[in-house]
Amino acid sequence: MRSDETQVQHMTGLVRSIQVGIPHDLPPEHLDDQPAHPWSTGIFKRLVRGPVRLHQQNLEGDGQADLIHHGGLDKAICVYPSEHWFHWSSILPQQQPIGGEFGENFTLEGLTEADVCIGDVFSVGSAIVQISQPRQPCWKLARRWQIKDLAVQVQQTGFTGWYFRVLQEGVVESNRPLRLLERPYPEWTVTTANRIMHHEQDNLSAAEHLSFCPLLSFSWQQTLRQRSRQQASPDPRQRQFGDLHS
């Protein structure tokens, strides 16, 4: 048996907690030297107790305010590893994690970006999910925690988490295992994808190579392909800081 087949058979994580939340309109808030603006977000999640239905585009009771950059088939579930709390505990004002601090739906234990790959297929409860792309943090995470450059910090550390698409709808529950079923692209860890996207902007061949991974989300394929062809791509400051980046 090949080593990668053995790895697939034995790789398991734990869904420590599940969070959902619907979008809310929030009043203006000042953030450092930035002017106050009202904002709408679904980043504030509540813990789910007991089983919850996982649909093709989201968990029951979950929603996103910005449907252009969040949600959809490739971003049905946002996932974040609990292992990163040790790093963020010295930066965020909250002392103990309760789940959902980064707006995630699944808070995991036992799997990080270095352990999982684009296209990995997992069973969770009666559902089947697949990794589509790393998460790209936006300005709403910074606004939530009142730390202006938090999205940039998350991106630079590589502690981004990732997204699942849903291959089979089902019922999921916290404190249940997440079991790896298939690994079609072991070369494309989430860590590697993050590095190519955010730290190796001049590596055009790597961008092109990753862009042709068929299980990578369409938006990442498009961005990387534009880069490899030296075409204009979106300014990341818009995502990281919103309309106040200039």
Q: Which residue stretches match the model-derived regions?
A:
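Short beta-strand His + acidic residue motifs that chelate non-heme Fe in jelly-roll/DSBH
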Residues: I131, F164-V166
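Short, structured beta-strand/loop micro-motifs enriched in basic residues and often containing a Trp
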Residues: F102-L111, V154-F164
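Short hydrophobic beta/alpha edge segments that flank linear recognition/processing sites
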Residues: L178-L181
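Electropositive, beta-rich accessory/interaction domains or terminal extensions
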Residues: R2-A142, D149, Y185-S246
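Loop/turn positions that initiate beta-strands
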Residues: G119, E169, E173-R176
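Hydrophobic, well-ordered secondary-structure segments
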Residues: T160-G161, N175, V190
